[in-house]
Amino acid sequence: MAVEPQTGRLSAGRAQLLAIAFALVSGMSAVIASALASHALGHYSPTAQASWDVAARMHLAHSLLMLLMSLCWAQHAYRLLGVSCLLLGLGVILFSVNIYARVLFGDSFVSRLTALGGLCLMAGWLVPLPILSDLWRRHGTGALRS
């Protein structure tokens, strides 16, 4: 984080801006994936369509979480928020994109990484937890009540 000399406001660094941009593009691509599911995958099996739907829902939900984490990271210099963004982005790629590829192209070695993507998504939720402890220590119990 840097302080802008003219305004005295904190400005986000390149990594934070990149995380925000990635989250926005990821969210847009999740919407595209959902549109494809309802308009272009009619000839695929119900199992394939259900897999695609799960991937698209997970993609969108975690893109929103990644956007939230990246916006918080741009405001507060907690490195764990950046780690969370990285894990969520990697998780979306390894989980959702692998499922999309498996539906379109069939099973491959790369699709075996889907479980690793799921673990990255789970870790993306948990990594910021120590920030709560830090906030608790700094501000006492009142910080979490208000």
Region spans (language model):
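Membrane-helix boundary connector in multi-pass membrane proteins
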Residues: V97-L113, I131-S133
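Interfacial loop at the N-terminal end of multi-pass membrane proteins
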Residues: E4-G13, L36-R57
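Short, charged juxtamembrane terminal tails flanking transmembrane helices
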Residues: A2-T7, R137-S146
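Hydrophobic cores of alpha-helical transmembrane segments in multi-pass inner/ER membrane proteins
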Residues: A61-M69, L121-I131
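Interfacial segments of alpha-helical transmembrane regions
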Residues: S11-V25, L80-L88
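Hydrophobic alpha-helical segments of small multi-pass membrane proteins
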Residues: G82-I99, T114-P128
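Core segments of alpha-helical transmembrane spans in multipass integral membrane proteins
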Residues: V25-L36, A50-Q75, R79, L88-I93
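Non-cytosolic membrane-interface motifs at loop->transmembrane helix junctions
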Residues: A48-D53, D107-L119
